[in-house]
Amino acid sequence: MAKQVKRKRRPQIKINTFCRFTAAGITRIDYKDVDTLLKNINESGKITPSRMTGTSAKFQRQLTTAIKRARFLALIPYTDKHKK
């Protein structure tokens, strides 16, 4: 009978441990605030997950909706190939 190989889990890396929006006292994230939205998108254009940024679930949902609206209105690019 063959031996079972134990796989090692990759350690999770958490960069921030606090929500930036809660600390700043922000109540809503607006799609027109392009600078804030661009800080939460990586270089390939993907939305950065909350486990990397430390954003709370409430603000992560608002952030995702705002980024999608801003993309639709062409305020921010969908991918890195669409430069302004």
Curated annotation (Swiss-Prot):
Keywords: Ribonucleoprotein, Ribosomal protein, RNA-binding, rRNA-binding. GO terms for cellular component: cytosolic small ribosomal subunit. The keyword Plastid does not apply. One of its GO terms (molecular function) is structural constituent of ribosome. InterPro entries: Ribosomal_bS18, Ribosomal_bS18_sf. GO terms for biological process: translation. The keyword Secreted does not apply. Disulfide bonds: none annotated. Binds as a heterodimer with protein bS6 to the central domain of the 16S rRNA, where it helps stabilize the platform of the 30S subunit. Belongs to the bacterial ribosomal protein bS18 family. NCBIfam families: S18. Part of the 30S ribosomal subunit. Forms a tight heterodimer with protein bS6. This is Small ribosomal subunit protein bS18. It comes from Ruthia magnifica subsp. Calyptogena magnifica.
